[in-house]
Amino acid sequence: MPQKTSKRFKKALEMVEPGKSYSVVEAAELLGKFPKAKFDESVEIAFKMTIDPRKTDQMIRGTVRLPNGSGKEVKVLVFAKDGEAANAAKEAGAEFVGFEEYIEKVTSGWTGFDVAVATPEAMAEVRKLGRVLGPRGLMPNPKTGTVTDDTAKAVKEVKAGRVEYKLDKGANIQVLAGKVSFTADQIAENANTIIDEIIKAKPSAAKGRYIENCVLSSTMSPVSYTHLTLPTKA
């Protein structure tokens, strides 16, 4: 049975020029003109890559700090045995800090947090939580700065708008770029920062064209139609 298309979606679709590649600023301005949902929609930038996620030398993963923040309230869990690291994490604003009690909670399936940070000492036990954390992308990782003794720095960076990017099995990368309530300039600045970071992360094994296409969208916008014009180096 054909899926119904809402009037709001149809109206947004009418505002998109078929076949056009938008500059980042144009796309950000367009998102601001779309009919609004009843909530503050997230803005996301999505990349279709030409690299092969099955090859370890073409896998990319990292973090990027958004100049205007992500607009998302992030709940942070810090696994820390050491009192000093735990106290520093609490002072930095982490919602959940501890070790054994949170190992037990997560083992039972609890995932009431958005980002997990762990000290290197704690990782021997945290790794055993892979069944719960892994599928949700919550496992602490040195590449994303979430395995560290400097728990205060990690918490502050996450709270300030550091977001993670990772190539998935379908050779896609999706990154949070802000909220619809942001100004077009704020969204564009965040999006350009992400684009620059993805380009810098190009593996040396990747030859030729690196990014097949790129789309900027909000939660309820016509995602397939707001393609971006990318730098030639992409």
Question: Predicted regions span which residues?
Answer:
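Residue-level signature of catalytic and energy-coupling elements of molecular machines
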Residues: 27, 89, 134, 216
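Flexible glycine-/small-residue-rich
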Residues: 47, 80, 119-120, 177-179, ...
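Flexible, glycine/charged-enriched surface loops at secondary-structure junctions
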Residues: 39-43, 201-213
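Long, charge-patterned amphipathic alpha-helical coiled-coil/hairpin "stalk" segments used as oligomerization
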Residues: 95-199
